[in-house]
Design a protein with these regions (language model features):
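Hydrophobic residues embedded in beta-strands of well-ordered beta-sheets
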Residues: 13-14, 46, 257
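A structural boundary/capping signal
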Residues: 56-409
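Generic beta-strand structural signal
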Residues: 8-10, 252
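Short beta-strand segments
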Residues: 24, 47, 281-283
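Trp-centered recognition loops
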Residues: 1-5
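Ligand-recognition surfaces built from glycine- and aromatic
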Residues: 31-72
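Short, solvent-exposed beta-strand-to-loop segments that form ligand-recognition rims
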Residues: 11, 15-37, 42
Length: 409
């Protein structure tokens, strides 16, 4: 990646550098006011990341003490020293084998460098997963920032975006939509305006050309491209509604995810008439289709009978786990078991007792011949529920793993 830096000074002077090398120094007094942005042309194609602007950029927050500690811990992976003339002569004295010896050492250093890169990636992923788990740890649903948690899923795979920028972007979208509300509008009118503004005016829409692309599950890319899956578009709708003081929840139906607004008074109905009357006091939003629908249309989208569906709000933790399961499926289609394992690791960090995800991870470990890890997951399943009818095939696989040399814990 090349580092591009542009500085615009008060006297109209514009300084542009590439990799800290000044390439443009001009004065243009006509450019006053306006906005800072990034212009990307189709030809030639280019990619950008870490776009930032500020009056002054802060210096690195890395503490020397931390650097020393990290390098001390990893010094066995790398070694380097400058060579003087005397050292060079000693190498020359070795003779014709010296070049090959240096080449071999170079390959060793490359391998060590690769090991450090992998370690860095793993540590970064684990830190993000820990942050995601913490974001979902609140017992009160209102305290969970669903958009932040969804953005952290994208952060697992892509570190090169500023998460807070997207939270601010959501705030800005909500403010823009709020400006369209009539002064004395009620919640139902505001929900309809939110639907119209987000999907008709702003152009957010369901992805149809490449539905299973991972970008549709990355909230930062969904917000950039204004295109996504039913669940990611619904999350954006829910979070914008929350910023507009509208109580909208997720509605996780089989095969399709929706958003739902339910009027406060509907919660006070007697149990006998709850199902019949609640439908009259709710608004169901199909974010993928960009429209308001009723229960009959929701049932049609799932292919199930309406009486077989539970129109109950989905907990935020379950919404995040559903996003991760989507990514597990996408990685499976792409024959990417490493990514599958990463997403399953995240699900199990959120819900360690998720038996289906643990069994799925055990099978992936088994296929990858990581037998001890597979055995660890299988033992967890057997010990956590000894009477489960699903245990017999697990015991068969366990015996097979031990015969193949996996160590029992």
């Amino acid at each position: 990646w090349n580092l591009l830096h542009v500085r615009f000074e008060e006297n109209g002077r514009i300084l542009c550098s590439v990799n800290k090398q000044l390439v443009i120094d001009v004065i243009d007094l006509e450019k006053e006011g306006g906005f800072i942005g990034l212009c990307k042309f189709r030809e030639p194609t280019a990619s950008f990341r870490n776009f930032r602007f500020a009056k002054r950029f802060s210096s690195s927050q890395v503490k020397p003490k931390s650097v020393f500690k990290l390098r001390k811990l990893t010094r066995n992976l790398s070694a380097h020293r400058a060579l003087g003339e005397a050292d060079l002569q000693q190498i020359l004295d070795i003779g014709k084998t010296a070049p090959q010896m240096l080449q071999d050492y170079s390959e060793e250093l490359k391998q060590r460098s690769d090991d450090l890169q992998k370690l860095s990636k793993e540590i970064r992923e684990r830190l993000v997963i820990a942050e995601l788990v913490e974001s979902l740890s609140y017992s009160d649903e209102k305290s969970i920032d669903l958009l932040k948690s969804a953005l952290l899923i994208a952060r697992i795979d892509n570190e090169h975006f500023n998460l807070n920028d997207y939270l601010k972007k959501a705030d800005a979208l909500a403010d823009q939509i709020k400006s369209e509300f009539p002064k004395h509008s009620n919640d139902e009118q505001r929900i309809k305006i939110l639907v119209s503004q987000l999907f008709n005016e702003m152009g957010f829409h369901g992805s149809t050309l490449d539905f299973h692309h991972r970008s549709n599950s990355y909230m930062n890319e969904v917000m950039d491209d204004r295109e996504g899956l039913p669940i990611t578009l619904s999350i954006l709708f829910i979070e914008l509604a929350d910023r507009l003081n509208l109580k909208v929840t997720g509605l996780g139906l089989p095969g399709h995810f929706l958003a739902m607004y339910r009027k406060p008074q509907s919660l006070e109905l007697d149990q006998e008439n709850l199902t019949r009357n609640t439908a009259k006091h709710e608004i169901i939003i199909d974010a993928f289709g960009g429209k308001i629908i009723d229960r009959q249309e929701a049932a049609r989208l799932t292919g199930l009978a309406i009486e077989d569906l539970a129109f109950e709000p989905s907990p935020k933790k379950e919404i995040i786990k559903r996003m991760l399961r989507n990514l597990v499926q996408v990685a499976g289609r792409e024959k990417d078991p490493i990514s599958q394992t990463r997403y399953l690791d995240t699900i199990l960090a959120i819900s360690p007792d998720d038996r289906y995800s643990r069994a799925q991870r055990a099978m992936i470990y088994y296929i990858r011949e990581e037998f001890e890890r597979a055995l660890s997951d299988i033992d967890y399943l057997l010990e956590s529920d000894p009477e489960s009818p699903e245990n017999q095939p697990l015991r068969v696989i366990r015996n097979r793993l031990i015969n193949q040399g996996a160590a029992a814990f």
